[in-house]
Amino acid sequence: MGFEQGDAKKGANLFKTRCAQCHTLKAGEGNKIGPELHGLFGRKTGSVAGYSYTDANKQKGIEWNHDTLFEYLENPKKYIPGTKMAFGGLKKPKDRNDLITFLEQETK
């Protein structure tokens, strides 16, 4: 099973409670503990200017899209061993779908 369109409103709540402490969404909001997510879709791992990534993130070499985010958000440390993202992941596929649907709308 892979990505399916989710509920952006539920994704917004997930972002607020699970992601917003470390990430921003809009252009120019800048990096926090984690990199700014503006322009996320179609971007390569480890490529946000001014953010200090681990070598693991820089060398992963994948492009963020629905499918890569769906897999990554289940267990970030398994998908990119050595990442400094201190997030255990979203185990429920529905939660990942909701969050990815929200991110696609809000990071353009």
UniProtKB/Swiss-Prot annotation:
GO terms for cellular component: mitochondrial intermembrane space. It is found in: Mitochondrion intermembrane space. Electron carrier protein. The oxidized form of the cytochrome c heme group can accept an electron from the heme group of the cytochrome c1 subunit of cytochrome reductase. Cytochrome c then transfers this electron to the cytochrome oxidase complex, the final protein carrier in the mitochondrial electron-transport chain. GO terms for molecular function: electron transfer activity; heme binding; metal ion binding. The keyword Lipid metabolism does not apply. Heme c binds at C19, C22, H23, M85. This is Cytochrome c. Belongs to the cytochrome c family. PANTHER family: CYTOCHROME C (PTHR11961). Pfam families: Cytochrom_C (PF00034). Keywords: Electron transport, Heme, Iron, Metal-binding, Mitochondrion, Respiratory chain, Transport. Its main location: mitochondrion. The keyword Heme applies. Binds 1 heme c group covalently per subunit.
